[in-house]
């Protein structure tokens, strides 16, 4: 018995990036990364999956509608990250021996389960630069300067 043909398609709110889009996109990411590193920021990678309680901490009940949430094979309540900052907060709490100030950048996909619309996808890249453990307005100024340098 022959199996039914599966229609090749992408889920609503998601998209493929073919080479003609990926090549300039990758160049842009490389340019941004170079600016971040020139300012002394280090790359950070975190898992796409986090315990749901970590991701619910920032917005609580409001975050529920953002989460792609499920129970994994081990029975744990997990979700795809919808924001990179929450993973940074977990890293800062989990690893007490990070340098102070901890200057990190992260460019990675995030997922939001909210309704997709024109220009609003369920999977997209987020680009973050943060300084953890620095007091005062100079850290804020430095982040603004980095943003300015990326845009110019």
Go through each PLM region and give its residues.
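TRNA-recognition modules of translation machinery and tRNA-sensing kinases, especially anticodon-binding
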Residues: 1-152
């Amino acid at each position: 018995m022959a199996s039914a043909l599966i229609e090749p398609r992408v889920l609503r709110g998601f998209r493929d990036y073919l080479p003609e889009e990926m090549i300039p996109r990758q160049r842009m990411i490389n340019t941004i990364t170079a600016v971040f590193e020139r300012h002394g920021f280090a790359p950070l990678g975190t898992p796409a999956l986090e315990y749901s309680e970590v991701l619910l901490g920032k917005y609580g009940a409001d975050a529920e509608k953002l989460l792609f949430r499920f129970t994994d094979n081990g029975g744990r309540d997990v979700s795809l990250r919808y924001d990179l900052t929450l993973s940074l907060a977990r890293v800062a709490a989990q690893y007490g021996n990070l340098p102070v100030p901890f200057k990190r950048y992260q460019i990675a996909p995030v997922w939001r389960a909210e309704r997709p619309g024109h220009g609003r996808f369920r999977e997209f890249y987020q680009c973050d630069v943060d300084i953890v453990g620095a007091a005062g307005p100079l850290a804020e100024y430095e982040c603004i300067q980095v943003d300015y340098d990326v845009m110019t």
